[in-house]
């Protein structure tokens, strides 16, 4: 049998006889002995061949070359089969692990609460394996079409939730309602944090406005207002009254009568209360009255009270630059943005009483009420008494998060103000309704629709927004180090629907390109046309106002931000008043539900686009235009700069380095391997640095919290440098050359630093600055 088997194998392998060596496994382990045995076997075979030759047998020597080919072929086939099996098993394990990791956002919270795994699997239907951008847009649009925003807005304006002034019981009740709602929506996590902040409220003694006769001493009480202005100086002042239109800097400059030592009365609108008061104080006024004229605010009720604040900044003004946590103990300090003069709101009816004792018609260019007068006569003065007091309150910020599947430590923040001095239907209820419904829809898309955002989505409900974005600012101050290079965009939902005619945007230049794409995708719910109507829309983007919660994100933290609204050419008249109710809102905006859906679609597409794509949709090249525009403006003063023995060469160089850095980053992105997560993350990290590095590192966050050189406030900003340089031509005695030298040098180095940060690692920085 053995001979037959050997004969068969010999035939199979080309007729070559096979030889083998007898040796034990125990000896083979020793290594060298096995070689000896193999050599002996070969010698044995050789001896057999010699003996056969000696015996005269005619035998043909086998061809070993063919055998080697066959052995090699078998080995290759075996290696291929083994490799295939290993790869297949490894792939199965990876798929199993990935399916375990890529659970829907709500799974974590469900397991924490003790839900059985079988229930979880049964609850979530099978989702598509991959969704394209068009699929996501369609899914979002379909879910929005079935959403009744008006019912949510109406619910938020029920008696149980208003009035909800910051720190009140109703504000706290709404906070916990929102937190519980986030949990019901099965977000990855819902939580809140609390801050203890100082706000100003009306004291036990009423504020008052009276007319005093200069000769007779006669006193006539005009009003003890229900409304007030938070953070006013508590004081009593008396003087003549001068009308200063809207209270802008230009309005004060154009007045024929000086306001030094006088009270001023100004119209609401155009700029914030805080800016009006700051301008009045800079022109040495001793007090400010603010009223709503009928021309700009066509409200029938002339007695309506209204509210605002006078802090030229955001956050708790008594912990500037610091978080207002209960366990922090800072030395007594206060913001430089607090006014040093009293300020008070008065009704239109009582403003007209004051005009009855004033002289001179207001200029027709003001386009205000016919009752308007310029200044009190010599026989009368006005006395203003403000008795507001400080009060420490506890506020809650509420959060929910949908964790990302690829980069959970990078997140977009979507927020809305929750509190309101009055009912706050337009001011806070619309934004809060958008926040809740977007959280519901996006969570549902993750749980059931197969949407797997690469990055996290944080939903935030802020308190004390009416006092100057206090809740949002305190959160930024408390977690600034944690948010750095993690929070990459803030989307503000406050006052998103105030009308139907216009779509207005305030945003960081990094978001311009993305906003334009979204505007082209979203149609106006009334006209049916795209929101993108004007190719020149970027030049119409409005700067963030101080009372916009997005402002501290951009100017204080260096986080790109966007705020938008559907509105009219005129201001919404009921903001900050007791008439900001649901009934007035639906009367002003009959298509409220459709407009809210459009606002939610804009915000939803922004969120999805920022979390869906591998590359962050932040167009860093837009800042090239901003820097170039600034350089051109400065270049107009070359002669003045040369007279000071300076030149702009280093500024030109910094601008060139920034341009080259953006070009290099664009090239790196185009050449990057999209499937390499490490490379893509490195590119995204470089993009995230851009906005942050426009925060001037040369000023104190405590003294100048809004450090952004483009969008901040203070002497370090580009606008301040240009304004100061103009003084050299207009009023050289007011020009400070030492200050200007510092401004120019620090601006140049800030731009250079942004260029270096964009370049990446230090060995990639290639400049000759």
UniProtKB/Swiss-Prot annotation:
Residues annotated with Phosphothreonine modification: 21
Keywords: Cell membrane, Disulfide bond, Endocytosis, Glycoprotein, Host-virus interaction, Lipoprotein, Membrane, Palmitate, Phosphoprotein, Receptor, Signal-anchor, Transmembrane, Transmembrane helix
Residue numbers bearing the Phosphoserine modification: 10, 19, 24
Primary location recorded for the protein, binned into one broad class: membrane
Motif Endocytosis signal: positions: 20-23
Subcellular location field: Cell membrane; Melanosome
Annotated GO CC locations: external side of plasma membrane; melanosome
Transmembrane feature ranges: 71-91
Motif (Cell attachment site): 655-657
Residues exposed to the Cytoplasmic side: 1-70
Membrane topology note: Single-pass type II membrane protein
InterPro entries, per the entry: PA_dom_sf, PA_domain, Peptidase_M28, Peptidase_M28B, TFR-like_dimer_dom, TFR-like_dimer_dom_sf, TfR1/2_PA
GO biological process: intracellular iron ion homeostasis; iron ion transport; positive regulation of B cell proliferation; positive regulation of isotype switching; positive regulation of T cell proliferation; receptor internalization; transferrin transport
Motif Stop-transfer sequence: chain residues: 61-64
Region annotation Mediates interaction with SH3BP4: where it falls in the sequence: 1-70
Post-translational modification: Stearoylated by ZDHHC6 which inhibits TFRC-mediated activation of the JNK pathway and promotes mitochondrial fragmentation. Stearoylation does not affect iron uptake.
Record domain PA: where: 232-322
CDD domains the UniProt entry points to: M28_TfR, PA_TfR
Gene Ontology MF terms: transferrin receptor activity
Function: Cellular uptake of iron occurs via receptor-mediated endocytosis of ligand-occupied transferrin receptor into specialized endosomes. Endosomal acidification leads to iron release. The apotransferrin-receptor complex is then recycled to the cell surface with a return to neutral pH and the concomitant loss of affinity of apotransferrin for its receptor. Transferrin receptor is necessary for development of erythrocytes and the nervous system. Positively regulates T and B cell proliferation through iron uptake.
Family statement: Belongs to the peptidase M28 family. M28B subfamily.
Domain notes: The YTRF endocytosis motif engages the clathrin-mediated endocytic machinery through adapter protein-2.
Subunit field text: Homodimer; disulfide-linked. Binds one transferrin molecule per subunit. Interacts with SH3BP4. Homodimer; disulfide-linked. Binds one transferrin or HFE molecule per subunit. Binds the HLA class II histocompatibility antigen, DR1. Interacts with SH3BP3. Interacts with STEAP3; facilitates TFRC endocytosis in erythroid precursor cells.
Protein name, UniProt field: Transferrin receptor protein 1
Naturally occurring in which organism (per UniProt): Felis catus (Cat)
Lineage: Eukaryota, Metazoa, Chordata, Craniata, Vertebrata
